[in-house]
Amino acid sequence: MFDKLFEPIQIRGMELRNRVVMSAMGTHESAESEDGKSVTDKLIAYHVARAKGGNGLNTVEVTSVDAPSAPFGFLSIAEDKYIAGFKKLNDAVHEAGGKTCIQLWQGGLAVASDQMAQILVPNDLPLSPQY
């Protein structure tokens, strides 16, 4: 009944070993990094374990695309300095037989938990006092 689930699939030239896809889950492991926004060895181990367990594709958690609004404890790819960490994660998951993708994110009001992050929203209406 679920034979197709475990068959390889090609998506625009990339082959996944099966159709098991892990959706993005917030681990907040980046909070343990020096700047609070980088890939950590613990995050890499988390994704490698899931690839070894059989996932064809792991979606890495929300990843900020804008430096001023990247809150502490969330991954960022807003600056080139983050590329090496993502490459290390990607290479490790490939070595374990899986693939990765990331969920790009501009946090909007969700970044309000970090007083240092700039809140960006798509309008010029005043924010409520809680923000």
Question: For each predicted feature, which ranges?
Answer:
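N-terminal amphipathic alpha-helix/helix-capping segment at the start of soluble metabolic enzymes
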Residues: 1-24, 93
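N-terminal binding-site loop/beta-alpha segment at the start of enzyme catalytic domains
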Residues: 11, 20-39
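Hydrophobic faces of well-ordered beta-strands that scaffold small-molecule active sites
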Residues: 20-23, 58-60, 100-104
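Conserved, mostly hydrophobic/aromatic
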Residues: 22, 50, 54, 93, ...
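Glycine-rich anion/phosphate-binding loops
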Residues: 31-49, 75-95, 113-115
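Glycine-rich, proline-tolerant flexible connector loops at the mouths of alpha/beta enzymes
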Residues: 33, 59-83, 104-116
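Catalytic domains of carbohydrate-active enzymes, especially glycoside hydrolases
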Residues: 42-66
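Non-globular sequence segments
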Residues: 94, 99, 105-131
